């Protein structure tokens, strides 16, 4: 599908608050050029500012909460809308996310109603130079449509990008590009996008999100094995461990392109992954395929930073 063919339809009755994760810790692997990625410039603009501006321009977004080093964030986001709230970081990813969730909940509390666990929030990373208001609105609309179609109040929607939406960012005609590994499902090749819609209070095992984030680089077998080990002893852990190893083995088999690969891929369904993730997280999970591949192109390392800067003018119009 062409990203221009957006499906802007009625989503939820009210706009969603957005949480932008712009925090950092002392781990140098989380930084690029020794810096918090939020404050890098791509295309002549600081990344976190670019993300915030896209969110503020999206019709489906209400308030935007940015969590990170508050003093530095105020400097680069000075002069932005009253719909922007800066939240000081308190620790690692999950702790920072909850600091922003609490700030959002505090803004919507009224009388004795208390916190509404059914209220969805958008959660997104700060280092997405190819984000746009249209892409954000489209993703939220797809989440709402999936929910309406199944009559299920999902706890978590996770964005995934398909190969067709990422081919345009490959190296071509002597120009640099970005090509990353995919998860090989029976119907398509997918990779995670850095955008989610969540009802965080409906996830009873949220602590696993931090574990998954720490070991998310599946191209490193040490991370894969560490992730699999973290599953064991949890509800649904053995099934999730087996599925993770199967998906990784399918990726390895794809390099040979023979019968074993075709057989393994045939059994890899997105629905199985959704059920396994839901069991681990203690909630219902739905993966949403976005036609906007830019959600998957974060500034992962210094090479990505260089390529995204070099190709920004070409790619920002896609």
Task: Explain the meaning of each model-derived region.
Residues 1-33:
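N-terminal nucleotide-binding beta1-loop-alpha1 segment
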Residues 34-52:
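Short catalytic helix/loop segments, enriched in acidic residues and glycine
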Residues 54-61:
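Short, acidic, metal-binding catalytic loop of nucleotide-sugar glycosyltransferases
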Residues 67-73:
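Short, polar loop motifs at secondary-structure junctions
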Residues 78-120, 130-131, 138:
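Short phosphate-binding loop-to-helix
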Residues 124-126:
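Active-site acidic Asp-centered loop
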Residues 133-278, 290-293:
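Conserved core of the sugar-phosphate nucleotidyltransferase
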Residues 271-318:
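ATP/nucleoside-binding phosphotransfer catalytic cores, i.e., glycine-rich phosphate-binding loops
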């Amino acid at each position: 599908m062409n990203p221009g063919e957006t499906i802007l339809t009625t989503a939820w009755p009210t706009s969603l608050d957005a949480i932008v994760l712009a925090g950092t810790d002392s781990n140098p692997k989380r930084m690029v050029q020794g810096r918090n990625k939020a404050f890098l410039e791509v295309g002549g603009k600081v990344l976190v500012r670019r993300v915030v501006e896209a969110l503020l321009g999206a019709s489906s977004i209400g308030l935007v909460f940015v969590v990170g080093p508050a003093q530095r964030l105020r400097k680069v986001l000075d002069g932005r809308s009253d719909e922007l709230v800066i939240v000081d970081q308190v620790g690692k990813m999950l702790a920072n996310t909850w600091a922003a969730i609490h700030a959002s909940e505090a803004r919507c509390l009224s009388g004795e109603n208390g916190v509404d666990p059914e209220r969805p929030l958008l959660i997104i990373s700060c280092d997405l130079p190819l984000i746009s208001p249209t892409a954000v609105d489209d993703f939220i609309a797809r989440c709402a449509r999936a929910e309406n179609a199944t009559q299920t109040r999902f706890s978590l929607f996770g964005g995934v990008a398909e190969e067709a939406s990422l081919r345009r960012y490959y190296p071509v005609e002597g120009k640099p590009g970005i090509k990353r590994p995919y998860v090989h499902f029976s119907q398509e090749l997918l990779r995670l996008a850095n955008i989610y819609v969540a009802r965080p209070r409906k996830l009873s095992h949220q602590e696993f999100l931090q574990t998954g984030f720490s070991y998310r680089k599946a191209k490193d077998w040490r991370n894969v094995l560490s992730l699999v080990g973290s599953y064991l002893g949890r509800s649904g852990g053995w099934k999730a461990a087996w599925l993770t190893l199967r998906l990784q083995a399918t990726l390895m088999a794809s390099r040979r392109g023979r019968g074993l690969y075709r057989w393994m891929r045939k059994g890899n369904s997105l629905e199985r992954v959704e059920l396994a993730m839901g069991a681990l997280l203690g909630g219902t999970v739905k993966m949403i395929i976005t036609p906007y591949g830019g959600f998957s192109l974060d500034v992962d390392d210094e090479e990505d930073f260089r390529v995204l800067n070099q190709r920004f003018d070409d790619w920002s119009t896609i």
